[in-house]
């Protein structure tokens, strides 16, 4: 279910402060965050945000196409290594 338009997008306050500070700097460093639930806003375009995936930080360079998505959508938490049986069947043939 989508979020109500009258509420606006959710962005953690501490992340928004870091974004505004980075926009003021001439050469901003990547922003490190654990806030996967925050929505990407137009203020974040052009910044690199390191999003935590549970183990390490995944760098996400924000472009116009990312606006409206959540930060967590670009930092997968699980690695798919394939189904066990399918590799053994290919080798056996």
From Swiss-Prot:
Keywords: Ribonucleoprotein, Ribosomal protein, RNA-binding, rRNA-binding. PROSITE patterns: RIBOSOMAL_S19. GO terms for biological process: ribosomal small subunit assembly; translation. Gene3D superfamilies: 30s Ribosomal Protein S19, Chain A. SUPFAM superfamilies: Ribosomal protein S19. Pfam families: Ribosomal_S19 (PF00203). GO terms for molecular function: rRNA binding; structural constituent of ribosome. One of its GO terms (cellular component) is small ribosomal subunit. Protein S19 forms a complex with S13 that binds strongly to the 16S ribosomal RNA. NCBIfam families: rpsS_bact. Belongs to the universal ribosomal protein uS19 family. This is Small ribosomal subunit protein uS19. It comes from Nautilia profundicola (strain ATCC BAA-1463 / DSM 18972 / AmH). The lineage of its organism: Bacteria, Pseudomonadati, Campylobacterota, Epsilonproteobacteria, Nautiliales. The gene is rpsS.
């Amino acid at each position: 279910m989508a979020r109500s338009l009258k509420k606006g997008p959710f962005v953690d306050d501490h992340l928004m402060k870091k974004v505004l500070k980075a926009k003021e700097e001439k050469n901003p460093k990547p922003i490190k965050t654990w806030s996967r639930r925050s929505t990407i806003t137009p203020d974040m375009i052009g910044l690199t945000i390191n999003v935590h995936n549970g183990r390490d930080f995944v760098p996400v360079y924000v472009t116009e196409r990312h606006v409206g998505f959540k930060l967590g959508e670009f930092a997968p938490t699980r690695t798919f290594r394939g189904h066990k049986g399918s590799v053994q069947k290919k080798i056996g043939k």
